[in-house]
Design a protein with these regions (language model features):
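A conserved beta-strand-loop-helix scaffold within acyl/acetyltransferase catalytic domains
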Residues: 24-66, 74-84, 205-206, 211-313
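Catalytic core of tubulin tyrosine ligase-like
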Residues: 376
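Short, solvent-exposed loop/turn segments at secondary-structure junctions
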Residues: 130-132, 181, 209, 277-279, ...
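Acyl-donor binding region in acyl/amide transferases
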Residues: 84-166, 285-362
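Acyltransferase donor/substrate-recognition loop-hinge adjacent to the catalytic core
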Residues: 3-6, 152-230
Length: 378
């Protein structure tokens, strides 16, 4: 296969889209660190008739072949709303995987760059998805660490190829292991109580799934406002919020959700959503809920986990840096201890987001992964 010509083909059929998704699973089938996503969810994300992100974005997908064997994939995404908001002409690359072959990589990125120029774009950057809730960033440190459901894993040769092609650092995300203390840190407890009284806040917990539905829309509204300043973020549309609510709410573990509201009007001021790690369960499921995938996932979801993943933490801008995060973790730390949690995976945090990283000052933490967004002028 070494001397075979590399051919690039645009994905135009559902069968080809399935092959696009499955290539990631095939490439990493022997990796102990890669966490495969659910094939059905990935197909929904990439399908123009199912993902409401296509109301504000357009995309193209390419596969690289040597003979009849797929050796690479890449998506080009133009988020029109993000470009309009920030007056940019950017294209994103994402959903990118490839064998360690310079010709394959060059031709894959060449196809997206050519399409980008045809569309009048000026800068290509990524890996990014359609929204901030898709996978972001290419792993550059931590290749011997188990991945999470919320983040990409890639082989260590990926970033070297990007640099070889003239791509440079745009921004990094850092990931931490946050070791759970046996008790709520004294300062956290004190700050949380002061904040609760000063701003008239209360903590909401859910015992039945139906109780969370009235808050779901408000949680995402708060997410839109709290994430507005973050790299690559685009405000979610009402249809996108509905899409994510229906996708994620059914799989949440209720005791690991904390919502902070104003007592006077029940407005969602902040929230913390975490889950027992599903990494090993997803590896066993191999991309499918059936025949046994859903059993592996349910067992992991309702187990006594040693690891939890912090998926989403958000606080309204006017309440940021005022101690609301302390209220969230004052609630979650006892929950984690009761479940036997040793540490939490922070998942990607922007290196420039000092406020979010400052909240770990009172915890033992370990920086174990770094991922990068690359860019290149076209």
């Amino acid at each position: 296969m070494e001397n075979m010509e590399v051919l690039i083909k645009e994905v135009t059929t559902k069968k080809e889209l399935m092959r696009f998704v499955k290539f990631n699973h095939e490439l990493y089938k022997d990796s102990p660190y890669h966490v495969p996503g659910l094939i059905a969810e990935e197909l929904m994300t990439l399908s123009k008739d199912k993902n409401p992100a296509f109301e504000i974005a357009e995309a193209i997908y390419f596969l690289a072949y040597k003979g009849d064997k797929i050796v690479g994939r890449i998506a080009g995404i133009i988020n029109r709303r993000n470009n309009e908001t920030y007056n940019k002409k950017n294209i994103r690359f994402g959903f990118v995987d490839f064998i360690d072959d310079a010709e394959v990589v060059d031709k894959l990125f060449g196809a997206v760059e050519c399409w980008a120029k045809e569309k009048g774009m000026e800068i290509i950057h990524g890996p990014l998805g359609f929204t901030d809730l898709d996978h972001e960033g290419m792993l550059i440190e931590g290749f011997d660490q188990l991945g999470t459901m919320a983040a990409l894993y890639n082989f260590d040769y990926y970033p070297a190829h990007l640099k070889r092609m003239g791509y440079a650092k745009d921004l990094d995300w850092q990931e931490f292991k946050i070791y759970i203390p046996k008790e709520v840190p004294e300062k956290h407890a004190r700050v949380g109580e002061i904040v609760r009284i000063k701003y008239g806040l209360k903590t909401i917990k859910f015992r039945k799934r139906k109780e969370i539905w009235p808050y779901a829309q408000r949680i995402f509204d708060t997410l839109n406002k709290s994430y507005a300043h973050l790299y690559g973020f685009t405000k979610l549309t009402p249809k996108q919020i509905d899409y994510y609510v229906k996708m994620y709410i059914p799989m949440l573990r209720l005791d690991m959700i904390t919502v902070i509201v104003r007592e006077e009007d029940d407005a969602v001021v902040g929230f913390g959503i975490s889950l027992p790690t599903l990494s090993r369960a997803l590896q066993k499921a191999k991309g499918s809920m059936f025949p046994l995938g859903f059993i592996y996932l349910l067992r992991a979801l309702y187990s006594k986990p040693k690891i939890v993943d912090l998926y989403l933490i958000g606080v309204l801008p006017e309440y940021q840096n005022k101690g609301v995060n302390a209220l969230i973790f004052n609630d979650l730390i006892p929950v984690y201890n009761k479940a036997g949690v040793v540490y939490a995976e922070s998942n990607p945090e922007l290196e420039t987001n000092n406020a979010i990283q400052a909240q770990w000052d009172y915890f033992k933490v370990e920086h174990h992964k770094t991922r990068r967004a690359f860019f290149k002028k076209l």
